[in-house]
From Swiss-Prot:
Subunit structure: Part of the 30S ribosomal subunit. Forms a bridge to the 50S subunit in the 70S ribosome, contacting the 23S rRNA.
GO molecular function, one term: structural constituent of ribosome
Name of the protein in question: Small ribosomal subunit protein uS15
Keywords of the record: Ribonucleoprotein, Ribosomal protein, RNA-binding, rRNA-binding
């Protein structure tokens, strides 16, 4: 269910702002989005998995907070990120 190390490395490489950047909001949101998408596929097959659903809701809330922070600090980077990830708003 979790992302493999190679998938994480590819996402970090695609969204990092500089070499070795793993903590920028863009990278964090991209990783959360990938995890959320994987969990959504999991729930199509496992509708009764309420324990994991709680984790999904937590990830969605964390992503929302990071997106709100990025929108406050740098609206241009925010708009570029949601366009690249295909998120609404």
């Amino acid at each position: 269910m979790a992302l493999s190390a190679s998938e994480k490395a590819q996402i970090v490489k695609d969204f990092q702002q500089g070499d070795g950047d793993t903590g920028s909001p863009e990278v964090q949101v991209a990783l959360l989005s990938a995890n959320i998408n994987k969990l959504q596929d999991h729930f199509k097959a496992n509708k009764q998995d309420h324990h994991s659903r709680r984790g999904l809701i937590r990830m969605v809330n964390q992503r929302r907070k990071l997106l709100d922070y990025l929108k406050r600090k740098n609206a241009d980077r925010y708009l570029e990120l949601i366009q690249r990830l295909g998120l609404r708003r």
